[in-house]
């Protein structure tokens, strides 16, 4: 089990934990749960011994564990249902994504436009949807240049036709980022309420060399 001390110190000063730190605490609580379950099964067969005190003090904090796991799917993935606001933002993002892609696919499917492209694909540059345009055809696709290939033969252009949609999508990305920060703040505050028990669990697991 990884040490929770650094995370607990950060919680003490009111800092927010990252998704990775919260998942690390979940791993600790999962280990505590296994030890607790083991102690219950052993209790019926073995008389009290020096480990009984450890087993009594350990607490897996299942509601906290469940809430963190409900909201955080992986270190870089927060669940849509972590909050109703996040669910709404992501629904809007999917709709906006579909609209942008539909418009850009219409451009790609136009034989004239396609002849100006290095590849008939939609790419992302700096969070903006772009088309890979042949450098010599730059004037044929009005838009904003966001990048170019190492050889300079391809320009990644955001067509003017989707600039406004891309702006709206970018705003949604920022809203998503803000909401994820709020979710992590809330989970961190919740976790801070149990800092003492988490520290106890870690100490016991370390003593047991778990």
What residue ranges belong to the model's regions?
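SMC-family hinge/dimerization module
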Residues: 121, 125-156, 166
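Conserved amphipathic alpha-helical "coupling/scaffold" segments
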Residues: 1-85, 89, 194-197, 201-210
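Short hinge/gating elements
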Residues: 75-89, 148-154, 169, 184-194
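Long amphipathic alpha-helical coiled-coil segments
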Residues: 46-57, 156-157, 162-167, 186-190
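Extended, charged coiled-coil "arm/hinge" scaffolds of SMC/Rad50-like chromosome-maintenance ATPases
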Residues: 60-73, 164-185
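Extended, Lys/Arg-enriched charged tracts that mediate electrostatic binding to polyanionic substrates
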Residues: 87-137
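Intracellular alpha-helical coupling/juxtamembrane segments of multi-pass membrane proteins
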Residues: 89, 93-96, 176-183, 187-208
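Coiled-coil heptad-register positions
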Residues: 40-43, 47, 104, 108-111, ...
């Amino acid at each position: 089990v990884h040490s929770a001390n650094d995370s607990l110190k950060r919680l003490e000063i009111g800092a927010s934990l990252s998704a990775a730190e919260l998942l690390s605490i979940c791993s600790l609580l999962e280990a505590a749960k296994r030890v607790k379950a083991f102690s219950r099964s052993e209790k019926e067969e073995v008389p009290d011994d020096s480990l009984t005190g450890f087993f009594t003090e350990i607490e897996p904090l299942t509601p906290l564990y469940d809430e963190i796991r409900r909201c955080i799917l992986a270190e870089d993935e927060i669940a849509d249902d972590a909050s109703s606001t996040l669910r709404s933002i992501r629904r809007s993002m999917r709709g906006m994504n579909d609209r942008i892609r539909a418009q850009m696919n219409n451009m790609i499917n136009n034989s004239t436009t396609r002849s100006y492209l290095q590849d008939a694909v939609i790419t992302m540059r700096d969070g903006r949807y772009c088309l890979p345009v042949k450098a010599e055809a730059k004037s044929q696709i009005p838009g904003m240049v966001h990048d170019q290939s190492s050889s300079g033969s391809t320009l990644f252009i955001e067509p003017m036709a989707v600039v406004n949609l891309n702006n709206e999508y970018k705003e949604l990305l920022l809203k998503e980022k803000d909401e994820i920060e709020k979710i992590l703040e809330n989970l961190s505050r919740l976790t801070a309420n149990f800092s003492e028990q988490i520290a106890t669990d870690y100490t016991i697991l370390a003593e047991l060399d778990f």
